[in-house]
Amino acid sequence: MIITRTPFRISFFGGGTDYPDWYNNNPGAVISTTINKYCYITCRPLPPFFDYKYRIRYHKKEETKNIQEIKHPSVRECLKYTKTIQGLEIVHHADLPARSGLGSSSTFTVGMLHALNALHGKMMSKRQLALDAIDIEQNIIKENVGSQDQTNAAFGGFNHIEFNKTKKIIVNPIILSKMKISKISSHLMLFFTGFSRTASDISKHQITAIKKNKIDMTHNYELVEEA
């Protein structure tokens, strides 16, 4: 049995400049950090005694005979991406609900990839996990997502992350003393409003507006460098 624990994130500066539509033509950067709230993925081989091959548990229950029947897009495409053909039971648990604005879908994808690769006996680098998750979400599932959530989930920690048209993601850890980290934490408050929303829908409007809001986007990038 493989269990992965992958952190959620909060973003401070640079949001929007991590979309490929922006950083393919302009420099992009964010300052963000992962937090002590996690997504847990449990993955184990399923004995061949059932009339289905894949048993998947999240807020829904799925039992399917083949990968193509799986409705959860990230589970389905991660299985294909890692060329996993054996029967599996996959169970998802999380400290926070989905669609809470903390990068939960990308955190799930990174954790799923990590679990499946571990099941195959492969230890992926943080960078490769991030790049694979970005590829799956942006190019295969066609989600309207940026590139910071996957990078944060894969690398963890407090980081200054740079994006550019070469597709090379540069992760610069922000090294702070325990005293400074404690001071920052003591000035942060995070609330759950009880409302949820689909990030892809919001991002779709943001991506459409990128060309129109170049001044604002450039300012977002400059704020990162100033911070």
Model-derived regions: residue spans:
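C-terminal nucleotide
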Residues: 1-13, 18-21, 30-32, 36-84, ...
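Short glycine/proline-enriched turns and hinge-like loops at secondary-structure junctions
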Residues: 23-25, 103-104, 144-145
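Short, well-ordered coil loops that connect the C-terminus of an alpha-helix to the N-terminus
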Residues: 84-85, 122
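Residues at or immediately flanking beta-strands
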Residues: 87-89
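Short pre-catalytic strand/loop immediately N-terminal to key active-site residues, enriched for Gly-Thr
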Residues: 96-100
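DPxDG-like acidic metal-binding loop motif
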Residues: 102-126
